[in-house]
Regions:
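Membrane-helix interface segments
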Residues: 5-9, 83-95, 115-119
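Short, basic, low-complexity termini and linkers enriched in Ser/Thr/Gly/Pro
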Residues: 142-151
């Protein structure tokens, strides 16, 4: 693999993985994200209850899980498709790596004082990865080839 191909296809994958890792630190813990989600919601709806703020924050955080792993899986699929002629194999490898990274990410969070690791979050991450793969595959023009075929 030449440097140009690596930079074009694999550097975005690695950069996104670093972004996810940094997000797993205290930097994006619930305590820190509540500092901007709560005030925004109170500005938007001054009479909002604390319970509603907490619920919205939870939904936003879980949507972030879905989105970050959808992007990771799509980037992996894009990179694998450059060297892997079989769509199904690229799809499976992308999902597997995203799922393993999700599990490792939650394991990492279990060692961060302000975070907790959760198997439910791994499930949400895997659902996001699957959604990202399906969306990318559909939008990229690969939809003409069925999963398992060569093109």
């Amino acid at each position: 693999m030449n440097l140009r191909r690596f930079l074009k296809y694999w550097l975005p994958v690695l950069a996104w993985m670093v972004f996810i890792f940094i997000g797993s630190t205290d930097l994006l813990s619930a305590e820190h994200t509540s500092r901007f989600i709560g005030p925004f919601l109170r500005w938007f709806a001054p009479d909002i209850s604390e319970a509603t703020v907490a619920s919205v924050q939870l939904v936003v955080r879980k949507c972030a899980h879905l989105t970050e792993y959808a992007i990771l899986a799509a980037l992996l699929f894009r990179a694998f498709r450059q060297s892997q002629p079989r769509v199904g194999r690229a799809f499976a490898m992308s999902f597997f790596i995203a799922a393993v990274y999700a599990a490792l990410d939650e394991f990492h969070q279990s060692y961060v004082a302000s975070r907790t690791g959760s198997p439910w979050d791994v499930l949400i991450d895997c659902i996001g990865a699957l959604a990202g793969l399906v969306i990318y595959w559909t939008l990229s023009g690969n939809r003409k080839s069925k999963i398992g075929n060569r093109k």
